[in-house]
Amino acid sequence: MIRKKRMSKGIAKILSGFLVFGMVAGLVPAAPDQTVHAKAADVSKPGVTVYATKEQLMTAFTPDASGTNANVGKLLFGINASDTAQGWYILGKDNGVQGDNTIIFAASPIATGKFNNEQKNKAYMKDYGTYTDGDSAEECAANHYGASNLRVTLQGMASNKDYFSDAEQTLMQATTVATTDTKAKKDYTTTDKLYALEGVRDAIILKAGSDNSVQLQRSVYWSEDEFWLRSPYESSYLGSYDYAANCTSTEEQKVKDKYVDETKAIRPATNLNLSNVLFASAVSVKSGKIEEAMTLRLDGKNKGIGTATYNVLKKEIKVNRGDTADTVNLIVQYKSGGQETLYGCPIERSQDVKLPYEDVDLSKCKIWLETTSDGLIYAVEATEENGGTPAEEHTGSHLIDLPQGATWTGINSLDNDLSAGYYYLTDNVNLTETWTPQDGVVLCLNG
């Protein structure tokens, strides 16, 4: 069972309802030797960098014109050459790609390699790219990205199960990018699932996306590695630098040129189809933690996972497990006292689940069931149970028969001088210490 909870003393939100948390009916008088304690009830929705909806994956992380964003989101997708999960920066929707999608850019090297194996020109072939003027080139220089070994390496990765499972490969979409042929002095386009970024010499901004619309500031996205770009080195000396291509420089912290047969890191970009994605979350069942990077959760309604509903008043989650033979986990993610928090447990049968923390407002939590298949996580989001009473509504007077002549009295503060009687709170109360009721005081709380 996964249980992560960071408690902090602070504001307690006390509402009208039942005195005993979780009771279905009945009130219990608050006797003098009983106390109501301040509780860590500052519960809110998780932050966007640890839980992002499909819409947020397309909009919340897009860098601005300066190449930065206050929200820097990461996603785990695929495996790198070191056989560890590959992290990617989330860059937002590419308007040049149809449907719901997001660009992602490798946050660390996925592998290493050469731009080209040799400093030699090649005869032009159709597969090397389509020239925007409708013509073609006779010969490609060694720094021609379309004809490069770097591009061949990326094409191989995109279809290699050692890097991306079959299911992951179906999410990767081709992007058409334009690159300059310095030898022919014109632009050409290539279309691939994985592609290298663009960056001109001495720049501190790299560009991603089908029309280079996404700009990436060095200090935020690419200061730590030297990796190949698709841009050739452009020189005023004809032919002098046909064997040099651009890459990032950690020493000079900008784009520089290197000979094509040198070995550098490979940090490509790709585009993910989000049409079947529900959300992304940094919750990891494997580690039992909220990680630095999120993982996609795809629609699992046809995966036999089951369904879940939650009741805000009862603080209860009902799970109807499906017939899948795969492991199913219940996840509850939220923020408590400013700290990202999760609760999770495996679901082996249909059951009712109560969180071990009485102060959690389920209406502010993200709740779902999930299972993993072929490297992807599939989820079914919980829905709120129909019926029940809104949390802000006083309920005790509707359910309890008071003694003859007694009435409910609304109060907006807790006063130790309250006389014997039946009370409910008309407003939230900031409780900084314990409160002890007097004899005969019955206080109705919503637990």
Identify what each model region corresponds to.
Residues G10-P32:
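Sec-dependent N-terminal signal peptides of Gram-positive bacterial secreted proteins and lipoproteins
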Residues I14, F18, V255-I266, W435-Q438:
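Extracellular interaction modules
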Residues A41-T327, I331-T372, L376-E384:
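Collagenous Gly-X-Y triple-helix signature in extracellular proteins
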Residues M1-G10:
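N-terminal secretory signal peptides that target proteins for export/translocation
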Residues V24-S44, V283-V285:
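Sec-dependent signal peptide cleavage junction
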Residues I367, E385-Y422:
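Extracellular "leader-to-stem" segments immediately downstream of a signal peptide or signal-anchor
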